Protein backbone atom coordinates (compact mmCIF):
# COMPACT_ATOMS: atom_id res chain seq x y z
CA UNK A 1 0.00 0.00 0.00
CA UNK A 2 2.78 2.46 0.91
CA UNK A 3 4.30 2.10 -2.52
CA UNK A 4 1.17 3.05 -4.43
CA UNK A 5 -1.03 5.14 -2.12
CA UNK A 6 -1.33 8.88 -2.73
CA UNK A 7 -0.90 10.05 0.86
CA UNK A 8 0.34 13.29 2.41
CA UNK A 9 1.78 11.79 5.58
CA UNK A 10 1.82 8.54 7.56
CA UNK A 11 0.97 7.86 11.19
CA UNK A 12 2.41 4.53 12.34
CA UNK A 13 0.31 3.06 15.19
CA UNK A 14 1.30 -0.59 14.81
CA UNK A 15 2.69 -2.57 17.74
CA UNK A 16 6.25 -1.38 18.47
CA UNK A 17 7.81 -4.56 17.06
CA UNK A 18 6.22 -3.69 13.69
CA UNK A 19 7.34 -0.05 13.50
CA UNK A 20 10.52 -0.33 11.48
CA UNK A 21 9.30 -1.64 8.12
CA UNK A 22 6.56 0.94 7.42
CA UNK A 23 8.54 3.77 9.00
CA UNK A 24 11.65 3.17 6.91
CA UNK A 25 9.63 2.64 3.73
CA UNK A 26 7.84 5.95 4.24
CA UNK A 27 10.99 7.87 5.16
CA UNK A 28 12.65 6.51 2.03
CA UNK A 29 9.81 8.14 0.07
CA UNK A 30 10.70 11.44 1.70
CA UNK A 31 7.27 12.10 3.17
CA UNK A 32 6.30 13.21 6.72
CA UNK A 33 6.02 10.51 9.39
CA UNK A 34 4.48 10.54 12.86
CA UNK A 35 5.65 7.45 14.71
CA UNK A 36 3.89 6.37 17.89
CA UNK A 37 6.14 5.78 20.86
CA UNK A 38 8.28 3.91 21.57
CA UNK A 39 10.29 4.47 18.41
CA UNK A 40 10.68 0.67 18.10
CA UNK A 41 10.74 -2.48 20.19
CA UNK A 42 14.49 -3.04 19.74
CA UNK A 43 17.51 -0.77 19.56
CA UNK A 44 18.50 -2.36 16.24
CA UNK A 45 15.17 -1.38 14.68
CA UNK A 46 15.36 2.05 16.29
CA UNK A 47 18.85 2.61 14.90
CA UNK A 48 17.61 1.71 11.42
CA UNK A 49 14.75 4.21 11.75
CA UNK A 50 17.10 6.95 12.99
CA UNK A 51 19.43 6.30 10.05
CA UNK A 52 16.52 6.42 7.60
CA UNK A 53 15.30 9.69 9.10
CA UNK A 54 18.78 11.20 8.93
CA UNK A 55 19.04 10.28 5.26
CA UNK A 56 15.57 11.51 4.36
CA UNK A 57 14.26 14.97 3.58
CA UNK A 58 11.10 14.05 5.52
CA UNK A 59 9.96 15.48 8.83
CA UNK A 60 9.70 12.72 11.45
CA UNK A 61 8.19 12.97 14.94
CA UNK A 62 7.89 10.36 17.69
CA UNK A 63 4.83 10.50 19.93
CA UNK A 64 6.24 11.26 23.38
CA UNK A 65 3.42 13.70 23.99
CA UNK A 66 4.54 14.96 27.40
CA UNK A 67 7.44 16.61 25.55
CA UNK A 68 4.76 18.81 23.99
CA UNK A 69 3.47 20.17 27.31
CA UNK A 70 3.39 23.95 27.06
CA UNK A 71 4.29 24.14 30.76
CA UNK A 72 7.40 21.98 30.35
CA UNK A 73 9.34 25.15 29.57
CA UNK A 74 8.13 26.66 32.85
CA UNK A 75 9.32 23.57 34.71
CA UNK A 76 12.74 23.73 33.07
CA UNK A 77 13.08 27.42 33.88
CA UNK A 78 12.28 26.68 37.52
CA UNK A 79 15.20 24.23 37.54
CA UNK A 80 17.57 26.34 35.41
CA UNK A 81 21.14 26.51 36.68
CA UNK A 82 20.54 23.75 39.22
CA UNK A 83 21.36 20.05 39.34
CA UNK A 84 18.41 17.78 39.98
CA UNK A 85 19.08 15.66 43.04
CA UNK A 86 15.84 13.70 43.20
CA UNK A 87 13.09 12.93 40.71
CA UNK A 88 10.07 10.75 41.46
CA UNK A 89 7.51 9.90 38.80
CA UNK A 90 4.39 7.74 38.86
CA UNK A 91 2.16 6.40 36.10
CA UNK A 92 -0.49 4.13 37.62
CA UNK A 93 -3.90 3.41 36.13
CA UNK A 94 -5.96 1.33 33.77
CA UNK A 95 -5.38 0.89 30.06
CA UNK A 96 -6.95 -0.98 27.18
CA UNK A 97 -5.59 -4.55 27.23
CA UNK A 98 -4.73 -4.85 23.56
CA UNK A 99 -3.35 -8.28 22.67
CA UNK A 100 0.07 -6.91 21.81
CA UNK A 101 0.18 -4.92 25.06
CA UNK A 102 0.07 -8.23 26.93
CA UNK A 103 2.83 -9.66 24.70
CA UNK A 104 6.18 -8.46 25.99
CA UNK A 105 8.00 -9.30 22.76
CA UNK A 106 5.55 -7.29 20.65
CA UNK A 107 4.95 -4.25 22.83
CA UNK A 108 7.20 -4.22 25.87
CA UNK A 109 4.31 -4.13 28.35
CA UNK A 110 4.19 -1.48 31.05
CA UNK A 111 7.87 -0.67 30.81
CA UNK A 112 7.56 0.64 27.25
CA UNK A 113 3.85 1.56 27.14
CA UNK A 114 3.90 3.67 30.32
CA UNK A 115 7.42 3.66 31.64
CA UNK A 116 9.04 5.12 28.55
CA UNK A 117 6.79 8.21 28.81
CA UNK A 118 8.15 8.78 32.32
CA UNK A 119 11.72 8.03 31.22
CA UNK A 120 11.43 10.55 28.41
CA UNK A 121 10.05 13.24 30.72
CA UNK A 122 12.76 12.49 33.30
CA UNK A 123 15.42 13.00 30.63
CA UNK A 124 13.80 16.29 29.64
CA UNK A 125 13.86 17.54 33.25
CA UNK A 126 16.99 16.01 34.78
CA UNK A 127 19.29 15.15 31.89
CA UNK A 128 20.73 11.94 30.53
CA UNK A 129 20.62 8.62 32.37
CA UNK A 130 23.80 6.57 32.75
CA UNK A 131 22.54 3.46 34.57
CA UNK A 132 19.32 1.77 35.64
CA UNK A 133 18.11 -0.56 38.38
CA UNK A 134 14.72 -2.24 38.17
CA UNK A 135 12.35 -4.55 40.02
CA UNK A 136 8.90 -5.92 39.21
CA UNK A 137 6.07 -7.11 41.46
CA UNK A 138 4.65 -10.61 41.07
CA UNK A 139 1.15 -9.38 42.02
CA UNK A 140 -1.47 -9.20 39.27
CA UNK A 141 -3.20 -5.83 39.58
CA UNK A 142 -5.29 -5.71 36.41
CA UNK A 143 -7.99 -8.27 35.55
CA UNK A 144 -7.67 -10.25 32.31
CA UNK A 145 -10.67 -11.33 30.29
CA UNK A 146 -8.53 -13.37 27.90
CA UNK A 147 -4.93 -14.60 27.87
CA UNK A 148 -2.92 -13.47 30.88
CA UNK A 149 0.08 -12.41 28.81
CA UNK A 150 3.66 -12.22 30.02
CA UNK A 151 4.03 -8.61 31.18
CA UNK A 152 4.65 -7.24 34.66
CA UNK A 153 1.71 -5.33 36.11
CA UNK A 154 3.93 -3.17 38.34
CA UNK A 155 7.53 -2.06 37.80
CA UNK A 156 9.83 0.30 39.69
CA UNK A 157 12.93 1.84 38.10
CA UNK A 158 15.84 3.67 39.69
CA UNK A 159 17.58 6.00 37.23
CA UNK A 160 21.13 7.23 37.79
CA UNK A 161 21.50 10.60 36.09
CA UNK A 162 24.72 11.75 34.49
CA UNK A 163 24.72 14.87 36.67
CA UNK A 164 24.66 12.79 39.86
CA UNK A 165 21.01 12.76 40.86
CA UNK A 166 18.65 9.82 41.21
CA UNK A 167 15.20 9.20 39.79
CA UNK A 168 12.53 6.71 40.81
CA UNK A 169 9.75 5.77 38.41
CA UNK A 170 6.76 3.66 39.45
CA UNK A 171 4.61 2.20 36.70
CA UNK A 172 1.54 0.01 37.17
CA UNK A 173 -1.39 -1.26 35.14
CA UNK A 174 -4.49 -1.48 37.33
CA UNK A 175 -8.21 -2.15 37.11
CA UNK A 176 -10.09 0.49 35.14
CA UNK A 177 -12.33 0.95 38.19
CA UNK A 178 -9.45 2.49 40.15
CA UNK A 179 -8.41 6.15 39.82
CA UNK A 180 -5.28 6.86 37.81
CA UNK A 181 -2.25 8.71 39.15
CA UNK A 182 0.20 10.41 36.77
CA UNK A 183 2.72 12.93 38.04
CA UNK A 184 6.40 13.77 38.52
CA UNK A 185 8.12 15.62 41.37
CA UNK A 186 11.59 17.12 41.05
CA UNK A 187 13.89 18.44 43.78
CA UNK A 188 17.00 20.57 43.22
CA UNK A 189 19.04 22.69 45.69
CA UNK A 190 16.75 25.72 45.33
CA UNK A 191 13.64 24.27 43.72
CA UNK A 192 10.93 21.73 44.41
CA UNK A 193 8.32 21.34 41.69
CA UNK A 194 5.49 19.00 40.79
CA UNK A 195 3.97 18.33 37.40
CA UNK A 196 0.51 16.81 37.57
CA UNK A 197 -0.01 14.97 34.29
CA UNK A 198 -3.11 13.24 32.91
CA UNK A 199 -5.72 14.65 33.10
CA UNK A 200 -4.95 18.00 34.78
CA UNK A 201 -1.55 19.05 33.37
CA UNK A 202 -0.48 21.69 35.87
CA UNK A 203 2.77 22.82 37.49
CA UNK A 204 3.25 23.85 41.12
CA UNK A 205 6.11 24.37 43.53
CA UNK A 206 8.83 26.79 44.60
CA UNK A 207 11.98 28.00 42.82
CA UNK A 208 14.57 30.33 44.34
CA UNK A 209 12.11 31.39 47.03
CA UNK A 210 9.29 32.25 44.64
CA UNK A 211 6.11 30.26 43.97
CA UNK A 212 5.83 28.41 40.68
CA UNK A 213 2.40 27.79 39.17
CA UNK A 214 1.13 27.18 35.65
CA UNK A 215 -1.71 25.33 33.95
CA UNK A 216 -1.42 23.82 30.48
CA UNK A 217 -3.42 25.70 27.87
CA UNK A 218 -3.58 22.74 25.48
CA UNK A 219 -3.53 18.99 25.81
CA UNK A 220 -0.04 17.73 24.99
CA UNK A 221 -1.29 15.13 22.50
CA UNK A 222 -3.05 17.83 20.48
CA UNK A 223 -0.04 20.12 20.67
CA UNK A 224 2.32 17.33 19.59
CA UNK A 225 0.18 16.66 16.51
CA UNK A 226 -0.20 20.37 15.73
CA UNK A 227 3.57 20.87 15.91
CA UNK A 228 4.14 17.89 13.63
CA UNK A 229 1.66 19.17 11.05
CA UNK A 230 3.27 22.61 11.18
CA UNK A 231 6.69 21.03 10.71
CA UNK A 232 5.45 18.94 7.80
CA UNK A 233 3.88 21.94 6.08
CA UNK A 234 6.92 24.17 6.52
CA UNK A 235 9.62 21.53 6.13
CA UNK A 236 11.07 22.61 9.50
CA UNK A 237 11.97 19.45 11.49
CA UNK A 238 12.96 21.48 14.56
CA UNK A 239 9.26 22.17 15.20
CA UNK A 240 8.54 18.57 16.24
CA UNK A 241 8.50 17.93 19.99
CA UNK A 242 10.43 14.65 19.92
CA UNK A 243 12.70 13.65 17.03
CA UNK A 244 13.96 10.09 16.34
CA UNK A 245 17.42 10.82 17.76
CA UNK A 246 15.89 11.79 21.08
CA UNK A 247 13.43 8.90 21.10
CA UNK A 248 16.19 6.31 20.66
CA UNK A 249 17.93 7.72 23.75
CA UNK A 250 14.75 7.07 25.74
CA UNK A 251 14.55 3.55 24.30
CA UNK A 252 18.17 2.91 25.34
CA UNK A 253 17.22 3.66 28.95
CA UNK A 254 14.18 1.38 28.70
CA UNK A 255 16.35 -1.37 27.20
CA UNK A 256 18.77 -1.04 30.11
CA UNK A 257 15.79 -1.30 32.47
CA UNK A 258 14.68 -4.51 30.77
CA UNK A 259 18.16 -5.94 31.22
CA UNK A 260 18.15 -4.83 34.86
CA UNK A 261 14.83 -6.61 35.41
CA UNK A 262 16.23 -9.80 33.92
CA UNK A 263 19.59 -9.73 35.69
CA UNK A 264 18.87 -8.01 38.99
CA UNK A 265 21.95 -5.87 38.37
CA UNK A 266 22.58 -2.19 37.83
CA UNK A 267 22.89 -1.86 34.04
CA UNK A 268 24.81 0.96 32.35
CA UNK A 269 22.84 2.58 29.56
CA UNK A 270 25.98 3.02 27.48
CA UNK A 271 26.50 -0.75 27.15
CA UNK A 272 23.33 -1.09 25.07
CA UNK A 273 22.93 0.11 21.50
Question: In which residue ranges do the predicted regions lie?
Answer:
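Beta-loop-alpha module in the N-terminal Rossmann-like domain of NAD(P)-dependent dehydrogenases
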Residues: 1-50
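C-terminal helix-rich "cap/oligomerization" subdomain common to oxidoreductases
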Residues: 9-12, 58, 231-273
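A general structural signal for well-ordered alpha-helical segments in protein cores
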Residues: 19, 23, 46, 72, ...
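A short helix->loop->beta-strand "cap" motif at the edges of active sites that frequently abuts
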Residues: 29-31, 56-58, 165-166
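Rossmann-fold dehydrogenase core element
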Residues: 48-65, 83-89
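Predominantly a Rossmann-like dinucleotide-binding segment in NAD(P)-dependent oxidoreductases
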Residues: 66-148, 264
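Contiguous beta-strand/loop segments that form the cofactor/metal-binding neighborhood of enzyme cores
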Residues: 120-200, 225-236, 273
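Active-site loop of classical SDR/Rossmann-like NAD(P)-dependent oxidoreductases
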Residues: 195, 215-226, 242
Amino acid sequence: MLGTADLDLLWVCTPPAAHAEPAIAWLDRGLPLYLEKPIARSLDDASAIVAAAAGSRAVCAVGYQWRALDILGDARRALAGQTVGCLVGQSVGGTQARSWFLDNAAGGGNLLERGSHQIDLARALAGEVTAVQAAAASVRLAPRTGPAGDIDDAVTLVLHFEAGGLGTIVVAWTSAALPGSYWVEVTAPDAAIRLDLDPHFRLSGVSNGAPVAAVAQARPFDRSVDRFVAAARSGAPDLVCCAPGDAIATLAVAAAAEEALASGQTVPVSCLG
